[in-house]
Curated annotation (Swiss-Prot):
It comes from Arabidopsis thaliana. This is Pentatricopeptide repeat-containing protein At1g74750. SMART domains: SMR. Belongs to the PPR family. P subfamily. PPR repeats lie at residues 358-392, 393-427, 428-462, 463-497, 498-532, 533-567, 568-602, 603-637. InterPro entries: Pentatricopeptide_rpt (IPR002885), Smr_dom (IPR002625), Smr_dom_sf (IPR036063), TPR-like_helical_dom_sf (IPR011990). Residues 755-838 form the Smr domain. The keyword Repeat applies. Keywords: Repeat. It comes from the Eukaryota. The keyword Transport does not apply. Residues 21-40 are annotated as: Disordered. Pfam families: PPR (PF01535), PPR_1 (PF12854), PPR_2 (PF13041).
């Protein structure tokens, strides 16, 4: 029987890192600030052409662990070792783009949330970048009854591939399972561009004036549509100056020794005008009976943008002298991004003589608070709404469902769904579409499809937008054939696909690496009379890039400009990402510089792409400078940023690289670093580790599932390769129990189970398989029922440089051989190991199955 013990010097050395006094406590001043960019997910598995011996890699990890991942001392700058070439490139910071000032916390509004205990200025997992045009998320749009247009004017978030995928090879060799597309076949789509944009000059039309510089932009879901092709100026969402986060009694905090205040150099953006700074005696407002309503809305909005809510804002509004009705108030509230300012203005209006809020203003305020996850304030507001005689309607409930859903509070969203029906409000298409979307994104596809069925039973036949939502959900859940069937059903039912639907289908096929099908759909879309929008161009650029045709992708960029589409940060970020994945660091860098020259402010996903490129080619000093530039710009390293750094540390081939990655992890200031540093020893039953992981995942609740999956994969792989295998097993069990890996284990039919490991790193796959087989053994001993068949899916290396060299498959096959698992393969599928019948039952009775993960 295999016992839990230190197998080598590696284990004891690695364990000393977590158990020694060097592990800082909350009092040591090691803390984190964190905010999240739009999703983009860093997939953990890194394919290598050679198999590195476990013992050799393990010893390298152990040698570099102690002290390598400790946070930098307060006030002491990170010293780049002399062995690293000094960074000599031009500045990573924009030369003429200033970041706006960070307003302080509102002092006149005191908030208590029933669910969110602390107000995080930029919520983790929900850092949004405003794309500079009038974009709104589809579900938010339809929740507001703003039906998106289909005129090709939408800019939405790029697919998650904008985040650098470490599983892709550096070289341009394409996997053999992808049908090769010859360049001549692309002539009907996009030829090489003769007038390709010069990289060293500004590739985009610089339309942002000085008052646009430094503002943040919002990336959106694939289902969004915009209402204007022109860039719309939006103020940057303020960042809260707080650097402390706590959850469930666990402090993941960092006390920064270098508090930076970024002041906007843009004249008049972050400060009030001289006229408004003058102190004037308070006089009664002079009603302007014949004032243009648009004039009032514009000027009040301008005042509220200049001031944080407080005495100065009230004074400015009083001096302006106006009479506002509920309609105008609603228009102002819709333009406000800071919930504290919006709430202060809302209650100030309520105190004005003759003013009365209506259902529209209450509903808009519910949406503002929902975006900030201020659910305690929402409940108070709903009570006031009822007391004021404004009964919540379907739109109000839809806003609330959407707010809970985007914060991953699915149970609360369903409770609101039930409450609205009890209150006599009938759910509409928007209600069902929202519930379908949030459950599918969280991995609960069965509930999503059940809601689709209930919608049809309620007599709500799906329209184009409903079909688009469900097709997107099915595709993102990995059910592309079902999504395609629904697309065909949609056409058969007389629902004409719009531009959004085509964009979804093209993106799904591109994600599935069906590049030729994606390009065919693109041609079909044009033949149907739809002109490409910025989303379409971005998807086609990605398809061409993954086919190895990066020059043609640049040609698409040039045509996009010729059609008067102004490239934004995600478009530039895609080109940075594509060239980085191709191993061309210089081209990736040139596109990053082109973005700065176009007057655009970098966003976190683009920085992550460039960071991954530097790490991949071991340019550590450049990675360090990029990370510092992010902090100087006020960009908070995201969960994906930390996942990249931890993955690089795990796969480091020298103690120097490992130590430097550890220092970068500390510099990032992400709460995940404190979580890793405070990892307790497993103990006799592993309960301390499970509690620690559970508290952290609760703290990171609002992060999207794919981001959490990427981090947990990196953590389990790191612990496994460091010899901390008991801890790795406990981390996996908690992550699986919290549905971080919804597709890892599935019962295909009665007593026929599927274990899906192909999206994991090799270390995580070994731990996941070991603990899952141990669970089967435990269930069999308790109930006497044994699975009749188990399929273990590893994939066969389609993402490897050479097909069939999947590191996951090799690691799993080695583990099964060591323990004499009675497996076989079917139909020549080397990426699926099958065990069944009596041999499987006899094998599960062996006692060593319980301790496989310790080998």
């Amino acid at each position: 029987m295999i016992r839990a013990k230190h197998i080598s010097n590696l284990s004891s050395s690695a364990r000393s890192f977590f158990l020694s006094g060097s592990r800082p406590s909350a009092a040591d001043g090691n803390s984190c600030t964190c905010a999240e960019d739009e999703s983009g997910v860093s997939k953990r598995q890194q394919i290598r052409t050679e198999v590195v011996q476990t013992g050799k890699r393990a010893s390298n990890l152990a040698a570099g662990l102690a002290g390598s991942i400790l946070p930098v001392e307060a006030g002491k700058p990170l010293v780049v070792p002399k062995t690293v070439e000094h960074f000599t490139r031009p500045s990573l910071l924009p030369q003429h783009v200033s970041s706006p000032a960070l307003p302080g916390k509102a002092d006149s509004v005191n908030h208590a949330s029933a669910i969110i205990k602390e107000d995080v200025g930029v919520p983790i997992g929900d850092q949004i970048f405003k794309a500079g045009i009038g974009n709104v998320n589809l579900l938010s749009d339809i929740a507001n009854y703003k039906i998106p247009l289909s005129d090709g004017t939408e800019v939405v978030g790029l697919p998650k591939s904008c985040m650098v995928d470490p599983t892709r090879p550096i070289s341009g060799v394409k996997s053999s399972n992808v049908k090769v597309i010859r360049r001549e076949h692309l002539a009907k789509v996009y030829p090489r561009s003769a007038d390709r944009v010069p990289i060293n000059s500004s590739p985009g039309t610089k339309q942002a004036s000085n008052d646009v510089a430094g503002k943040s932009f919002e990336a959106h879901d694939l289902l969004s549509n915009n209402v204007s092709g022109k860039r719309k100026i939006m103020p940057q969402r303020p960042y809260t100056d707080s650097t402390r986060y706590a959850s469930g009694g666990c402090d993941y905090s960092v006390h920064s020794s270098d508090d930076r205040t970024i002041i906007s150099s843009v004249e008049g953006f972050g400060k009030p005008s001289r006229e408004m700074m003058k102190v004037t005696p308070r006089t009664a407002p002079t009603p302007r009976q014949h004032c243009n309503p648009g004039y009032v809305v514009e000027n009040v909005s301008s005042i509220l943008r200049r001031f944080k809510w407080g005495h100065a804002a009230e004074e400015a509004l009083h001096n302006f002298g106006f009479r506002m009705d509920a309609y105008q108030a609603n228009q102002v509230l819709k333009q406000m991004d800071n919930y504290a300012n919006a709430l202060g203005f809302f209650y100030w209006l309520k105190r004005q003589p003759g003013f009365k809020h209506d259902g529209h203003t209450y509903t808009t305020m519910v949406g503002n608070l929902g975006r900030a996850k201020q659910f305690g304030e929402i409940n108070k507001l709903l009570d006031e709404m009822v007391r004021d005689g404004c009964k919540p309607n379907t739109v109000t409930y839809n806003r609330l469902i959407h707010s809970y859903g985007r914060a991953n509070y699915l149970k609360e969203a369903m409770n609101v769904f039930n409450q609205m029906q009890e209150a006599g409000c009938e759910p509409d298409r928007v209600t069902y579409c929202t519930l379908i979307d949030i459950h599918a994104k969280a991995g609960f596809l069965d509930i999503a499809m059940d809601m689709y069925q209930r919608m049809q039973e309620a007599g709500l036949s799906p329209d184009t937008f409903t079909y688009s939502v469900i097709i997107n959900c099915l595709g993102k859940a990995g059910h592309l054939p079902a999504a395609h069937r629904l697309f065909c059903e949609m056409v058969g039912q007389g629902c004409t696909p719009n531009l959004v639907t085509f964009n979804i289908m093209i993106a799904l096929h591109a994600k599935a690496r069906n590049y030729e099908t994606a390009l065919k759909l693109y041609r079909d879309m044009q033949n149907a009379g739809f002109q490409p929008d910025k989303v379409t161009y971005s998807i086609v650029m990605e398809v061409l890039g993954h086919c190895g045709f990066l020059e043609e992708a640049e040609g698409v960029f040039a045509e996009m400009q010729r059609k008067n589409w102004v490239p934004d940060e995600p478009v530039y970020g895609l080109l940075v990402d594509l060239w980085g994945k191709a191993g061309n660091v210089d081209k990736a860098w040139q596109w990053y510089q082109a973005m700065l020259q176009a007057g655009l402010r970098p966003n976190v996903p683009t920085c992550n792409s460039l960071l991954s490129t530097f790490l991949r080619v071991h340019r550590m000093s450049e990675a360090y400078n990029l990370l510092q530039s992010m902090l100087a710009l006020g960009l908070h390293p995201s969960l994906q940023t930390y996942t990249l750094l931890l993955s690089c540390c795990t796969d480091a081939r020298s103690n120097f690289d490992m130590g430097f990655c550890g220092q970068l992890m500390a510099v990032s200031g992400h709460p995940a670093h404190m979580f890793l540093l405070k990892m307790p020893p497993a103990g006799p039953d592993g309960q301390k580790v499970r509690d620690h992981v559970s508290n952290f995942l609760d703290f990171m609740h609002s992060e999207d599932r794919e981001s959490k999956r990427g981090l947990m994969d990196a953590v389990v792989d790191f612990l496994h390769k460091s010899g901390l295998k008991e801890e790795a097993g406990s981390v996996w069990e908690v992550a699986a129990g919290k549905n971080v890996y919804p597709d890892a284990l599935r019962e295909k039919s009665y007593s026929y189970w599927l274990i899906n490991l192909h999206v994991m790193s090799e270390g995580t796959a070994v731990i996941a398989l070991s603990r899952t087989l141990a669970w089967f053994r435990k269930q069999m001993l308790v109930s006497g029922d044994c699975p009749s068949r188990i399929d273990i899916v590893t994939g066969w290396g389609r993402r490897s440089r050479v097909t069939g060299t999947s590191m996951v498959r090799q690691a799993v096959e080695e583990l099964l051989n060591i323990f004499n698992f009675p497996f076989f393969t079917e139909n020549g599928n080397s990426g699926c190991f099958v065990g069944s019948g009596e041999p499987l039952k006899n094998w599960l009775l062996e006692s060593y199955v319980e301790r496989m993960h310790l080998l």
